[in-house]
């Protein structure tokens, strides 16, 4: 079981994996470190239970989900077979350049960890006597690899509070590098996706509306009001207003510049963020309840903000896309049936705003 700190940014935030051993530091140093990471909005993964089992598949998954690992070497670290297996997996990820490890030497010397000497070495060799030769070799290589990296040490007489501040500062510095890289990658994907969606929406009038809204999501990052122009354009030109064919296969649609497998994974997050941004831009609207604009007294100071008709359609359409994204990701039906679900939501939207729909289509 792991505890993951909450999300704080739109761009996916790299997680920090904490590896340690010992009840004596769990309720002291580790708990204070975890509190500090959470205060600074740093996502982290930490095992709640001291008895962690031997599920290496789960172990590898937790490490692979992280971009940074803090290995807290203490005198008892090497007595744990599970901890030693953790750093072996970390070394594999480091070799593949998928993980950055920061060794933290908590009241142990770095050379004792690397050379398996001192109190740390005694624990290691005691464990080695109960283990296989190939396993011992992997542990030794992992210890040397990780302990020789640039790390932080807590020596005698140093304040743990100051030491924790130094650790958090270093983690923030490292994460800033990853976040910058992720933002650049995200921007490149955005440009590629936009080009493909513009061409695809023009070429395939029977595409589900969700494709258009993904396009809107990226435009809305630059200007929230651009969404009105997109809606007006879609209504006037009749894009994606026609029902899909019964045998529509989303998989068969060719959209230049789009990998549909990656697209469906990106869509749910895109729709959620679009919905949140739109709700915030439109005023005092509670996203957790349906918004009823009909017969709303507009002269009351406590009533929701009065919205133009197109914005009402925009708001409802984002709800539609949220439903569509959910079904796309959650159902196990074929993509042809998913297309029918999207059209079902679109038909409900048309009926709710029939006057607006009829007027804009005639333009």
Swiss-Prot record:
Residue span, TIR domain: 12-175
GO cellular component: cytoplasm; nucleoplasm; nucleus
GO process annotations (BP): cAMP biosynthetic process; cGMP biosynthetic process; defense response; defense response by callose deposition; DNA catabolic process; induction of programmed cell death; NAD catabolic process; NADP catabolic process
Effect of residue 151 to R: Abolished ability to induce cell death
Enzyme class: hydrolase
Record EC number: 3.2.2.6, 3.2.2.-
Binding site for NAD(+): 21-26, 53
Record keyword Transmembrane helix present: no
Record: active site: 86
InterPro entries: TIR_dom, Toll_tir_struct_dom_sf
Function: Disease resistance (R) protein that specifically recognizes the HopBA1 type III effector protein from P.syringae, and triggers cell death. Acts as a NAD(+) hydrolase (NADase): in response to pathogen-recognition, catalyzes cleavage of NAD(+) into ADP-D-ribose (ADPR) and nicotinamide; NAD(+) cleavage triggering a defense system that promotes cell death. In addition to ADPR, also generates a cyclization variant of cyclic ADPR (cADPR), termed v-cADPR, for which the cyclizing bond is unknown. Also able to hydrolyze NADP(+), but not other NAD(+)-related molecules.
Quaternary structure and interacting proteins, as annotated: Homooligomer; homooligomerization is required for activity.
Swiss-Prot/TrEMBL domain comment: The TIR domain catalyzes the NAD(+) cleavage (NADase) activity. In contrast to classical TIR-NB-LRR receptor-like proteins, only contains a TIR domain.
Protein's name according to its UniProt entry: Disease resistance protein RBA1
Native source organism of the sequence: Arabidopsis thaliana (Mouse-ear cress)
């Amino acid at each position: 079981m792991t505890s993951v700190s909450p999300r704080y940014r739109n761009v996916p935030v790299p997680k920090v994996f904490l590896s340690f051993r010992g009840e004596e530091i769990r309720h002291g140093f580790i708990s204070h470190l975890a509190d500090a990471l959470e205060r600074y909005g740093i996502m982290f993964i930490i095992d709640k239970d001291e008895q962690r089992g031997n599920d290496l598949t789960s172990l590898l998954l937790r490490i692979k989900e992280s971009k940074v690992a803090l290995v807290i070497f203490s005198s008892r670290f090497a007595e744990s077979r599970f901890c030693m297996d953790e750093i072996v997996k970390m070394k594999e990820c480091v070799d593949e350049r998928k993980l950055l490890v920061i060794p933290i030497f908590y009241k142990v010397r770095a050379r004792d960890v690397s050379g398996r000497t001192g109190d740390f070495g005694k624990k290691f060799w005691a464990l080695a006597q109960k283990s296989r030769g190939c396993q011992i070799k992997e542990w030794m290589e992992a210890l040397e690899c990780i302990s020789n990296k640039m790390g932080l040490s807590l020596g005698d007489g140093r304040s743990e509070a100051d030491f924790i501040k130094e650790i958090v500062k270093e983690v923030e510095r490292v994460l800033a590098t990853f976040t910058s890289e992720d933002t650049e990658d995200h921007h490149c994907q955005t440009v590629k996706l936009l080009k493909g969606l513009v061409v695809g929406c023009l070429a395939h009038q029977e595409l589900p509306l969700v494709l258009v809204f993904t396009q809107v999501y990226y435009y809305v990052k630059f200007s929230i009001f651009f969404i009105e122009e997109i809606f007006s354009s879609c209504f006037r030109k009749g894009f994606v207003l026609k029902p899909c064919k019964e045998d529509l296969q989303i998989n068969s649609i060719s959209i230049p510049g789009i990998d549909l497998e990656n697209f469906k994974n990106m869509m749910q997050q895109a729709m959620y963020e679009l919905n949140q941004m739109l709700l915030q831009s439109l005023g005092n609207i509670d996203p957790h309840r349906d918004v009823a604009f009909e017969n709303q007294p507009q002269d009351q100071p406590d009533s929701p903000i009065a919205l133009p008709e197109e914005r009402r359609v925009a708001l409802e359409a984002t709800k539609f896309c949220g439903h569509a994204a959910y079904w796309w990701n959650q159902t196990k039906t074929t993509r042809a049936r998913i297309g029918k679900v999207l059209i079902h939501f679109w038909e409900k939207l048309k009926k709710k705003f029939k006057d607006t729909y009829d007027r804009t289509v005639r333009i």
